[in-house]
């Protein structure tokens, strides 16, 4: 017997960094460069494999366009895009603080998630957690006297009493020349907490979530969200009217703002955001977004739509940002999703790959097929796919019929027993499949 030889295992420390340095040197010497990325008026030469690994957006562009030049256009300066591409080689990105939002937006366009994550973390340091008693300095105390409480009960949630207090943060005061302006919005719930502590017993007995969480919410925030989150909070709080109902001191949400679909919880307390996975309800958008992370849901902070996958949220954010990275080479029309581009190409090629399995009509666009199924047949795409599977499994039972050719003696041969049994089982299976496919829950 041969003795078992021992395996030698070598692990080279910092091997990846050294390889990137060598590839960057080759790029600087313009050796083995197989692509040129044109960012408006700036050319960036490099290697497809490096750019594709660092930017999923460029990876898709390389797959769609097998040429040595790729043109992209970003809203920010061309130098911002150039620095982002060079960081794929060096792993280092350095820029002034006032350019943070520009780099965050450009990195989101290029789908460089590692840079988006770090920029989001850096952006959070400008948002300072509010102090518990800051509202006393800038806002009039509403609970100073019993008379103010009586006026509050008569006012029924007047805008003057319920309007939020806005204080510029210290960082924004120091950065007057910067493009970044951070404001800290104190919610109406905090002001009402200063007015009366008795109302706290009527709130839901759940663990409170901080309004300004120190944990980065990069999984829920895309490039355009950070720029508008303060504006959304302010508009949301201005429209959120609270009122007291007599001596019971029950806080009610204004139905004129949120409509009749608001659900009440705990003695008339009504909220705005309800978790689709559990019974928790939230008044503040930030708390609701933090809670959704527990269910592995990702929410758009602009429209409130939730997604089960982070990539779907990123594709959804392109619609809000107006980003359309997929362009038709024939007519130049751009699209926000690759599937929309592929559907559009059917117009140029004349292909109609989408077929209705109920009437054999074909369509170039899938949305047209869905509309056809709903209006004419009362079906959906899932039913249409099941109908196709049933048709594929439909068997010509005549092929299982025994041949009746007469032999030389004038006798007809009898069919094989196993052949008849198999045909019977197959016929029953097809009938069962048809019954299952037409079952409606």
UniProtKB/Swiss-Prot annotation:
Q: Which residues form the Glycyl lysine isopeptide (Lys-Gly) (interchain with G-Cter in SUMO2) crosslink? A: 184, 255, 329
**Bias type Polar residues, positions:** 201-216
Q: Where is the BTB domain?
A: 33-97
Gene3D superfamilies per record: Classic Zinc Finger, Potassium Channel Kv1.1, Chain A
GO CC annotation terms, alphabetical: nucleoplasm
The entry's function note states:
May be involved in transcriptional regulation.
Protein's name according to its UniProt entry: Zinc finger and BTB domain-containing protein 26
């Amino acid at each position: 017997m041969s003795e078992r030889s021992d395996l030698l295992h070598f692990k080279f420390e910092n091997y990846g960094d050294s390889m990137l340095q060598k590839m960057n040197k080759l790029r600087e010497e313009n050796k083995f460069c197989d692509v040129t990325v044109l960012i408006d008026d700036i050319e960036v030469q490099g290697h497809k494999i490096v750019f594709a690994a660092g930017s999923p957006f460029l990876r898709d562009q390389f797959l769609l366009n097998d040429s040595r030049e790729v043109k992209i256009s970003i809203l920010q300066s061309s130098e911002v895009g150039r620095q982002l591409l060079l960081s794929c080689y060096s792993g280092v990105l350095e820029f002034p603080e006032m350019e943070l939002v520009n780099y965050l937006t450009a990195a989101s366009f290029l789908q460089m998630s590692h840079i988006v994550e770090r920029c989001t973390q850096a952006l959070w340091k400008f948002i300072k957690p509010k102090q518990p008693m800051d509202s006393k300095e800038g806002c009039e105390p509403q609970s100073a006297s019993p008379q103010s409480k009586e006026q509050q009960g008569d006012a029924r949630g007047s805008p003057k009493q319920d309007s939020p207090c806005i204080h510029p943060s210290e960082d924004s005061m120091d950065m007057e020349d910067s493009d970044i302006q951070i404001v800290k919005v104190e919610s109406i719930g905090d002001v009402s907490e200063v007015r009366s502590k008795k109302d706290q017993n009527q709130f839901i007995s759940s663990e409170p979530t901080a309004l300004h969480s120190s944990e980065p919410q990069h999984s829920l925030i895309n490039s355009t969200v950070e720029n508008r989150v303060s504006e959304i909070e302010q508009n949301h709080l201005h429209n959120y009217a609270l009122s007291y109902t007599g001596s019971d001191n029950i806080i009610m949400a204004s139905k004129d703002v949120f409509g009749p679909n608001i659900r009440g919880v705990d003695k008339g307390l009504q909220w705005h955001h309800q978790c689709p996975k559990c019974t928790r309800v939230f008044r503040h958008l930030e708390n609701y977004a933090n809670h959704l992370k527990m269910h592995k849901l990702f929410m758009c902070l602009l429209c409130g739509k939730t997604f089960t996958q982070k990539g779907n949220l990123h594709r959804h954010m392109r619609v809000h940002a107006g980003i359309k990275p997929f362009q038709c080479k024939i007519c130049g029309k751009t699209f926000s999703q690759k599937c929309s581009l592929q559907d559009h190409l059917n117009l140029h090629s004349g292909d109609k790959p989408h077929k209705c399995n109920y009437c054999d009509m074909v369509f170039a666009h899938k949305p047209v097929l869905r509309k056809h199924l709903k209006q004419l047949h009362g079906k959906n795409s899932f039913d249409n796919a099941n109908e196709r599977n049933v048709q594929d499994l439909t068997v010509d039972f005549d092929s299982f019929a025994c041949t009746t050719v007469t032999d030389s003696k004038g006798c007809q041969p009898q069919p094989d027993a196993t052949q008849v049994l198999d045909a019977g089982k197959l016929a029953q299976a097809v009938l069962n499949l048809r019954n299952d496919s037409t079952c409606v829950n």
